[in-house]
Amino acid sequence: VYIERKRFFVNKVNVKNELLKQINYGFGYGLGNLPRVYQGFVLNRCLKKLNEKCGTSFPGPSPDMSNAVGLCSIITNAIITNKHLIISGHSKKSAGGMGGRKEHVAELSEVKWLPKETKDLWSKKIPFYWTGPTIYSESARLALIRTNSNLVDKINYNYLYAILNIYEKKM
């Protein structure tokens, strides 16, 4: 058996361009190449700047997406590589485990770990239930608002609706 060895690479990512790409996807596909503390490394001074700006390093209900979008207001460039620096996993009961079983869908009131204000702040443009694409889109929206970004009105909700229609269980 021949296993192709990929060449090691390190690429510089223009954070604003990557953010615009994810905005065009309605934030429904995940984190893309956004900077992040989840499965990534971020300088402490960048996290402190985000905390000063928003009062938290996680300015939305999904910590991974809200942190990634929040960091876009602080960081200009990020670095990605194709070599594994972190090996992540998830338990059966985690959100990732639920996604693997195609059970990553629920009423917002059933998701006990969400911040209490999540339901009250939820956008009318995002379907009102919890699943990967909806919580990511809502978290990104709130992070854009809380970092005073003028890009919040550019979120492509039609793309989000298409993702939900094709890939997600219906509520």
Please identify what each model-predicted range represents.
Residues 1-60, 88-91:
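Donor-binding/catalytic cores of nucleotide-activated saccharide
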